Amino acid sequence: MAPYAPTDGISKLAIDQSKHFTEALKEALKSSADQQKVAAEKVSELVAGDANLNLGVVSQELRNALTGNDADAKVVAAHVVDDLMQKHAERVEAYLLPLLSVFLDLLGDKKPTVRPVAQEAALTIISSANKNSTIRILPILFDGLDRSKKWQTKKGALDLIAELSKVAPYQVGRCLPDIIPQVTDCMWDTRKEVKVAARDTMTKVCNVVGNMDIEPFIPALVSCLANPTEVPECTHKLASTTFVKTVEAPALAIMEPLLKRALAEGKTAVKRQAAVIIDNMCKLMDDPAEAQLFIPKLLPGLKKVIETQADPECREVATRAHETLFVAGGSMEVSEDELKVDYANIHKVVVESIAANPTAVKANIDSFVVDYVTGICYFLVVSRNFNKAVFEKEITTYIKAFMKPEEIKPLANEIRDRCFKENKSIFIEDVDCDEGIPDLCNCEFSLAYGGMILLNNARLRLKRGHRYGLCGPNGCGKSTLMRAISNGQLEGFPSRDELKTVFVEHNLQASEAELSVVDFILVDEDLKNTPRKEVEDTLAGVGFTAEMQAQGVGTLSGGWKMKLELARAMLQKADILLLDEPTNHLDVKNVAWLENYLTSLTNVTSIMVSHDSGFLDTVCTNIIHYETRKLKIYKGNLSKFVEQKPEAKAYYELESENVKFIFPEPGFLADIKNKGKPIIRLTNCSYQYPGTPKPSINNISVTCALSSRIAVLGPNGAGKSTLIKMLTGEVEPTSGQVWKHPSMRFAYVAQHAFHHIESHLDETANQYIQWRFQSGEDKELLAKETRKLSKEEKEHYKKPVNWEGEKRVLEEIVSRRKFKKSFEYELKWEKCPVDDNAWVPREKCEKWGWDKLLQIADDREAARANLQARPPTAIAVQKHLDCFGLGAEFGTHSRMRGLSGGQKVKVVLAAAMWLNPHILVLDEPTNYLDRDSLGALASAIKEFNGGVVMITHHNEFSSALTQETWNVEAGFLVIEGQQAEDKTKIEQKNEEEVTDAFGNVTKTKIKRKLTRKEKKAKDKARKEAEARGEYYSDSDEE
């Protein structure tokens, strides 16, 4: 038997049987302009009413009319196609779709009457055709974008692609890898109309991806395609986004052009960032077949970075991305040709399946339908749609004109079985939850933040009335997960209309600082209609007196601000309460109140992040734990969780094997022979804030030494932070004296630690530290009150002083040097040459009243000494950041805006320690750090050879580290447990290595102090050399 072949062309019999249609069409083509549409509708009705009419003849006759020279005939034929596709698309689309290319050419027709009807007919074909025929439509539209085509044709094709993205978004999404290059080329067209249309079309086709994470960046991505210079900035923007959806082929297709360009950028940082994004997006891809589509497109760029990039760290990241992409693609490296679905093979499957079915052979299915069905099957293969019902429905729609529906099913199954493989299923482990208690949510999602994959196909199931402790290491995404819930970014999580979710975090803004406490709550959009009495009663319930409710928000301490946030959340009557470090800034009494309040909420679910193990033990009914990018729920509180998972004992122990902080050695202090000798002293000091009726601090006297380990305790608002600010020089006492060693340096981490970096969030940690210390001085130190000169002080320093019998006016203090057991300072006088500079003892300068200027000079000299030993180069700064658990991924290559709260605190701590300080002052150091990091901090404090002063409500932390306690109550100080004087001898230590900006490492030579005998021999050698008339240098001895 001869092999089956579909009817190709039109037989003479078919033409004879269709003569009545041909005659009717010829008659319609002759109609006047005002009757053309009516005549076209009659022809359309004739086609619809004749089931035996050969539609191949219809297609051919319409093509002849559209390609002829008669403009009126073109208009009528276009109206016929438009009417048929609107009313009878299923029957005629296989025959009329090929005419789309003719309509594209007619968009540039010379006759103005032809162009609009051609546009209308083309739009109708696009909107009425089967959505799965998109893969057949697109090649026709791409042909219309060819450079040889008229600009009207190009613009029309672009408009049709945009329309296609509206009517068939899923199908367009699957075809994005083919669409984006074609439209991108048109963005560089010489014709303005084409460029504008291309940009608009690109935006619309990118929006079909339906990925809420990428949608905000689509304008930037589109702009990058037209302006490659924007690639670096766009890469940085995308690196700081939060991903909450599994990455599918359409999402990666949008990103691919940017990533390819970023990998080819000249800047190492951009290449590295692109590699990180590839690494993390591919980790979120579940289907290896989808990842394989991008292996031939992205792998070559990664290989080039690995082979040619000079920076070893960048090569390492690119290697990791290469491996992730390779694994995501099923550990197979395939070429682009191997991944293409062969249309000819699909056509062969359809033809052979028909040939194997006797009924189908007798049906004599024509080539128009075979080609159309092949196109639909081709798309189903490309999109890996394995649904039998869909497959059967699609084939039946077009073959039912030749066969009975019951005869088509075996044929459809045969075609389907030969085209598709079995779909792989993904097993998702469910979590252990209590049955019988209502679910608030049960959803599955993925989550990423910046350059890190946080969760992949994780399931979250929450029960009403349960209290969940969210546990995991710093940077794993605890706060990010809660923020994603609050912002409605999690797939399947109920909307805020169904489930009231309130996020309580440390983000109280100072812009409303003048509002009273009550008014601050009432301006909230969700609470503006709440009765004032209810607000006042709620505030009273958390401890706000009537007097406190009337005062400004800006006057509240950190603890009271957090209680205000909690009160606001209570008033919103949440179903789910999201608490980010709720015990931060709260004293013991208020922590107990919070525990009682949360446990009393039997109908409200709470999710909380806290590093206070006692709090989690008291409050939690369940623990949600991060495990290999999944969430696992354990029954019971923290102690029960640790019983089930012993490796989590770090939540109880203030020691860490996973994380280690290394504090730098304090700089050498002249005349300080042992660690117990005071290096700062406050005597009878008081401080009163402007406009307040009484002092915050009253008549205190304290000292600190290198051996000090001091805890500052007291209730919220007692004056602890004010005492610390006075100690560090952020404020000057209104009465009393402050003395400190001229070369002493402080490291100060404030209660609201982020204020140190809030104006630098678009920089990396490395860049921030380089900026802060690039001049050798700490730019934050320059902003302190003790460094600012008042008008009266400036006038005082301009008063003449008597020096060597002359009246002199100081211009500046230039430098400092050792003088006996003190210092002397080089003074530059006004209107005098440099040669007249004078070296004046410190005591003399103090007598003239220049204490503040001396302090400024001392700080500057101390900073300069550190700059010479350790210049703030990128390599040196990253080495320093490594000592605080912040690797290059987050320290050098990620902007601080994308870091977690704990990582930001590490940045602040590392920056504070850059100048090798002698005293470390920590205001609430346990805020935002996880247990591992707290353990690392505790170990570093124990090993630190400088003094430590800390404010903390974390009793476990302070009791393990301190021997002396300063109890502050209502502005008065009581000192307990003063430690014995440490007489440990101090030895000067120097940096063993210095790394310059080019990465060159220089070994430093440490000079040993000469013995008396060696000094005498050195003096004798010098005198002998001078007697011989020779120059003598110390280097001659080396």
From Swiss-Prot:
Residues holding ADP: E406, N716, E924, N927, H953
CDD domains: ABCF_EF-3, CD_eEF3
Organism from which the protein derives: Phytophthora infestans (strain T30-4)
Taxonomic path: Eukaryota, Sar, Stramenopiles, Oomycota, Peronosporales
PANTHER family listed in its UniProt record: ATP-BINDING TRANSPORT PROTEIN-RELATED (PTHR19211), ELONGATION FACTOR 3A-RELATED (PTHR19211:SF5)
Domain of life: Eukaryota
Record field: compositional bias (Basic and acidic residues): 1021-1031
Catalytic reaction list: ATP + H2O = ADP + phosphate + H(+)
Region of interest called Disordered, as start-end residue ranges on this chain: 1012-1038
Family: Belongs to the ABC transporter superfamily. ABCF family. EF3 subfamily.
A Pfam family annotated for this UniProt entry: HEAT_EF3_GNC1
Top EC class, one word: hydrolase
SUPFAM superfamilies: ARM repeat, Chromo domain-like, P-loop containing nucleoside triphosphate hydrolases
GO MF annotations in UniProt: ATP binding; ATP hydrolysis activity; RNA binding; translation elongation factor activity
HEAT repeat coordinates: 93-131, 133-170, 174-211, 213-249, 255-287, 292-331
Subunit relationships: Monomer.
Entry keywords, A to Z: ATP-binding, Cytoplasm, Elongation factor, Hydrolase, Nucleotide-binding, Protein biosynthesis, Repeat, RNA-binding
One annotated GO biological process: cytoplasmic translation
Function: Ribosome-dependent ATPase that functions in cytoplasmic translation elongation. Required for the ATP-dependent release of deacylated tRNA from the ribosomal E-site during protein biosynthesis. Stimulates the eEF1A-dependent binding of aminoacyl-tRNA to the ribosomal A-site, which has reduced affinity for tRNA as long as the E-site is occupied. Assists translation termination by stimulating the release of nascent protein from the ribosome by release factors.
Annotated pathway: Protein biosynthesis; polypeptide chain elongation
Name of the protein this chain belongs to: Elongation factor 3
GO cellular component, one term: cytoplasm
Disulfide bonds: none
